[in-house]
């Protein structure tokens, strides 16, 4: 109550932000008359003038008003479109590391030209990021004339471009592309073997369209570059045959049913667990098929891989449904995006789940892959110096944007008042009653000539409605993951008189629904249309538009509430664009998944008290509130999953940044001769320490073992025992120096034989290849560590802290092994000439050609730390290690005598 009172007096934070920005809008408007008088050449010359001022030390903020006025005037001349004041406000929000919530149809694409132009003036590059290739190409081509008029270059970064084409795209002032492609290019650049192979410049400014889709819906999807691992398809097929023998435990909360079933499903958490009886049954089935030894347990350490396959198969059969979570097309299992309803070809579930679904559907099982490089979108986008985004629905996720990315959300007002009528939800007892009511509503709308957009949450539901409409002889179009090739065409005409369009989650479709249909597309369909044809098309459209407005505008009809309020708001936002008439209503039933899982008891109780009859609906604010609370619960859980993913990935991210920074340093260096000299002393000394412990008596020395090891690993055949027998004054330190000097002399001899330039090139190639191989193994070790870390909770240990501690130890091991392996390879390999180095490089390129890009959707329980989710939610905490923390300037614990930052704290 007091909060509302204070807001009335002082205004909301959003109002205060907009009020501050309005002063700059007034400045831009004041400049408009002067800029209208400029010739085209004078207007174009503004770009060079701004760049000179920036070079002289001016800030972007100081030239913002003039730059925005320049873009507005150029847009009037090139597009005959003038930026509204609210678009100027949106542009300023986007320049200030914030997220602009702008309603559908408010011209987000045109708004983006303002901050894109301003930030491109620095010459550091601007990345405008969209959700798919079609939108990236469309927006780039639409805005290219404006930017080129102002003397800026535009690039498009999409899948399938060659290296030079990608370089050209990134070297442009403004680069349009998809989030996936920018992320993969970052990973590929950090796997390059020469600076010439890199395509990206340092990451400066990212402007993300549909920012909620990319930074929230995609946050659990790591980008992975992978190579094929061993084939285990036979095992998936065998395990798949076990699952139909298992029985679900129906009433997991009832004591009388405990132990009756083989597995239980937790629908809220989207998890499945074996019961004690189920575990025994699976073990017996595995023993019968000869896959498990008699008396052996599925949960023993030796059978972890088998347990992994059984769990994946159970999840595939019980939690993943065909035509809801995936479709089968041309013998392939293709994931369906739960948020947009789009198919995602090329994307695969991780943890062996995709192979288990392939086995379930009887299609070809593709090999599991080994991770070579990976990053989450959360950590990729935090690499940018400046980050901003725009969407029609950000306010419900404002806390997450601020908490994870440090981005405030500003709701930008609409240019015209919104007049869409959002009606209360109607709740029915059964799904059948709900569908009958939906059909009746559609018929009523068609009689009035009002277009209807029906939003469904799954392909299965959209096909069910389509069958009902065929039965009722209602003409309609279906837009879902199976038919999105016709997407733009269907959406463009969804606003025609009496049109009925069924769409699986409309989020991110990228094409506005224009009342009366899209006249631009009609003109584009004609070859060389005459002025008369254009005028006729526009006049016909105006007539249709007026008829649709009179009928009430576009009617949005939701068939089920989504888990996220934001997705529901996106569906509603398709109507009422730019002040158009429109309406929306959601039809629900007690059989809907959200209602069944989260809101059933309370709402069912209300309905029974009201004595509802068949076909009767309940419409009450209490019900709407109960549903909204259910959605909040799901949103909170999903936020916790994303937050925990980030906390785990932050550990890997710190290591990734160290490795990538060091790798780039090595690659950019003309020679790494000094690095090799530094690590050779460490490596040889560490080997000597194993056989001649420091400050030990000679009786404890294992000289034969040392001689053998030096010969096997470093090709050093040294008569150490002979030296000791002949030279009484030879002690531990002088012996150590002689062995290290012997290695240096042997290496110098190799250098004289092949030539310094060839050896320098070979050193770099060995260092990079060894680092890449060990990094790949390290990522696999980190994966295995993460998958089992939740079990530490049973030992009263904090799984997150244990993960941080053990991953640090793994990283220490990586650095130590890297040094040893590099010196060992350089010692053993005989390089004869430049051709040997070139052959090594050719083999590497051949291997590179085999790697593939995967988008792997991380499973929830893999992220939150185990089946029971017992690991408590916590804020990101500092890394805890056993013993004292090693400071960067402290002596390295390895005993080298050097500072930690110059030894194990760095690769060299």
From Swiss-Prot:
Region (Disordered) residue spans: 865-908
Binding site for Zn(2+): 892, 894, 903-904
Record keywords: ATP-binding, Cell inner membrane, Cell membrane, Cytoplasm, Membrane, Metal-binding, Nucleotide-binding, Protein transport, Translocase, Translocation, Transport, Zinc
Pfam families, alphabetized: P-loop_SecA (PF21090), SEC-C (PF02810), SecA_DEAD (PF07517), SecA_PP_bind (PF01043), SecA_SW (PF07516)
Keyword DNA damage among record annotations: no
One GO process term, biological-process aspect: protein import
E.C. no: 7.4.2.8
Residues that coordinate or bind ATP: 87, 105-109, 512
Cofactor: Zn(2+)
Top-level lineage group: Bacteria
Location, primary (coarse class): membrane
Annotated GO CC locations: cell envelope Sec protein transport complex; cytosol; plasma membrane
GO molecular function annotations of the record: ATP binding; metal ion binding; protein-exporting ATPase activity
Bilayer disposition of the protein: Peripheral membrane protein
Compartments where found: Cell inner membrane; Cytoplasm
Cofactor note: May bind 1 zinc ion per subunit.
Compositional bias per record (Basic and acidic residues), positions renumbered to this chain: 879-888
Chemical reaction(s) catalysed: ATP + H2O + cellular proteinSide 1 = ADP + phosphate + cellular proteinSide 2
Ranges of Basic residues composition bias in the record: 898-908
HAMAP family the UniProt entry points to: SecA
Family stated for the protein in its record: Belongs to the SecA family.
Role played: Part of the Sec protein translocase complex. Interacts with the SecYEG preprotein conducting channel. Has a central role in coupling the hydrolysis of ATP to the transfer of proteins into and across the cell membrane, serving both as a receptor for the preprotein-SecB complex and as an ATP-driven molecular motor driving the stepwise translocation of polypeptide chains across the membrane.
Subunit structure: Monomer and homodimer. Part of the essential Sec protein translocation apparatus which comprises SecA, SecYEG and auxiliary proteins SecDF-YajC and YidC.
Name of the molecule in the record: Protein translocase subunit SecA
Lineage: Bacteria, Pseudomonadati, Pseudomonadota, Gammaproteobacteria, Alteromonadales
